[in-house]
Each structure stands twice: as structure tokens, then as C-alpha cells.
Design a protein with these regions (language model features):
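Short, intrinsically disordered low-complexity segments
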Residues: 1-2, 116
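Sec-dependent signal peptide recognition
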Residues: 2-9
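C-terminal motif of bacterial Sec signal peptides marking the signal peptidase cleavage site
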Residues: 14-17
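Bacterial signal peptide processing site
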Residues: 19-22
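Mature extracytoplasmic or organellar-lumen-exposed domains after removal of signal/transit peptides
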Residues: 24-171
Length: 171
């Protein structure tokens, strides 16, 4: 008797759940174009502008360091590097459009840096940053290595740049 009741309830539940009068599910009632435009204007564009500004300031500091090769200009360059890297962290997720086409995120922040490739590129004086093999020899980790990892002391790092212009050119 229990089996028959259980079977009857199971069949009844199946029939009720298979109702053909289903409602058509409609999409959201808001305009996605307006949402995306708003996202671009108030989120993406300001962050990209900030990133470009920070990169430009880092480039100015880098050029200043290449000329002066002193402790003060190295510290300014390091400060601008940190600012630019922080700005990069805010735009890295925006991998759309031209950035996606040129694999910008693969060129900007590949970790770990390939120190052997960086050293080979600097020694040869010729390198192609469009070559995918150089992705781990460019970008922020490479700049980090060149500003902090060439030696233990700032004086020795400055000496490396003073003795070999290829290092300054690569930076």
C-alpha cells in the first residue's frame, strides 16, 4: 500500500511539474548601452587616463635618471615606478579593444621576470619587444628587477648604469 501511494504521489508530482503553460522569461528592462557607456565614462576612461599619466611621469623620471645617474634620480624613478605599477593594477582587468589585440597584459606584467633573457638583451643591445619570447623580459617585473635587483646597494645599481649605457637604454 505504501508503495502504491508513493508511486501515485511521484507520478502526480511529475505531471504537475510538467505544466505546458510556462511564462516567457524576458530580459532586463534597462538599456545595456547606457550602462556600458556610463561604465566607460566613469570607470574605464579615468583609470586609463591616470595610467597613461603615471607611465608618462615614469618615463620622464627614467630619462632624468639616464642623464644624471645619481641616488636622488634613482629614488624618484622608483617612486614613479610604484605609482605607475599601482595605476596598472587598476586597469589590468580592462583587457578589451586594442589592449586585447596586442596582448598588452602579457607584455606589461609577466611574472617572474626572465633575468637571463633581460641580460642577453642588454648585452646584445638588440631586442624585439614584439617577439613573444621577450614577454617575460619587459614590463613592470623587469623594471622592478632593473631598479631593485641588479645589486644589493643603490650605489652598485647606479654604478651598473654608469658603466654600461645598454642598461640605461633597456630601462
Amino acid at each position: 500500500m505504501k508503495k502504491a501511494t508513493l508511486t501515485f504521489l511521484l507520478i502526480l508530482t511529475t505531471i504537475i511539474s510538467c505544466n505546458e503553460a510556462s511564462e516567457e522569461i524576458s530580459g532586463p528592462s534597462y538599456d545595456r548601452g547606457t550602462l556600458l557607456n556610463n561604465w566607460y565614462i566613469y570607470s574605464i576612461q579615468p583609470r586609463l587616463s591616470e595610467f597613461k599619466s603615471k607611465i608618462d611621469m615614469m618615463e620622464v623620471a627614467s630619462n632624468e635618471f639616464k642623464i644624471k645617474k645619481d641616488n636622488a634620480s634613482l629614488n624618484i624613478l622608483r617612486e614613479k615606478y610604484v605609482d605607475a605599477h599601482m595605476a596598472w593594477q587598476r586597469v589590468e582587468m580592462i583587457n578589451i579593444g586594442k589592449a586585447e589585440e596586442i596582448y598588452y597584459n602579457s607584455k606589461m606584467n609577466v611574472y617572474p621576470v626572465n633575468v637571463a633573457r633581460v641580460t642577453a638583451n642588454i648585452s646584445s643591445g638588440t631586442y624585439d619587444f614584439n617577439n613573444a619570447n621577450n614577454n617575460a623580459a619587459q614590463g613592470f617585473p623587469t623594471i622592478d628587477y632593473m631598479l631593485y635587483g641588479l645589486d644589493e646597494s643603490d650605489e652598485k645599481i647606479i654604478e651598473v648604469y654608469a658603466n654600461d649605457d645598454n642598461y640605461a637604454n633597456y630601462l
